[in-house]
Amino acid sequence: MERGSKVKILRKESYWYQEIGTVAAMDKSGIKYPVLVRFEKVNYNNVNTNSFADNELIDLGK
């Protein structure tokens, strides 16, 4: 998984559950949710990004 990769969301409580987004950034410092994912549609707060852990994503490649 790298910047620009397409990923599918597995976190059930997420607004974007089962949606496909693009990896915008990855943090290597050891934080809990290091992968920032950008989506086409916005959520109810008018936000189109969210952070996820590696095990909450399926890498679909570029």
From Swiss-Prot:
Task: Give the CC-aspect GO terms.
Answer: chloroplast thylakoid membrane; photosystem I reaction center
InterPro entries of this UniProt entry?
Elect_transpt_acc-like_dom_sf, PSI_PsaE
> Which cellular compartments is it found in?
Plastid, Chloroplast thylakoid membrane
- BP GO terms, sorted: photosynthesis
> Which coarse location class describes where this protein primarily resides?
plastid
Signal sequence segment: none
Topology in membrane: Peripheral membrane protein
Which keywords annotate this record? Chloroplast, Membrane, Photosynthesis, Photosystem I, Plastid, Thylakoid
What Pfam families does the annotation carry? Answer: PSI_PsaE
Family label: Belongs to the PsaE family.
Q: Which PANTHER family match?
A: PHOTOSYSTEM I REACTION CENTER SUBUNIT IV A, CHLOROPLASTIC-RELATED, PHOTOSYSTEM I SUBUNIT IV
Query: What does this chain do?
Result: Stabilizes the interaction between PsaC and the PSI core, assists the docking of the ferredoxin to PSI and interacts with ferredoxin-NADP oxidoreductase.
Concerning HAMAP family, the annotation shows: PSI_PsaE
Q: What name is this protein filed under? A: Photosystem I reaction center subunit IV
Q: What is the lineage of its organism?
A: Eukaryota, Rhodophyta, Bangiophyceae, Bangiales, Bangiaceae
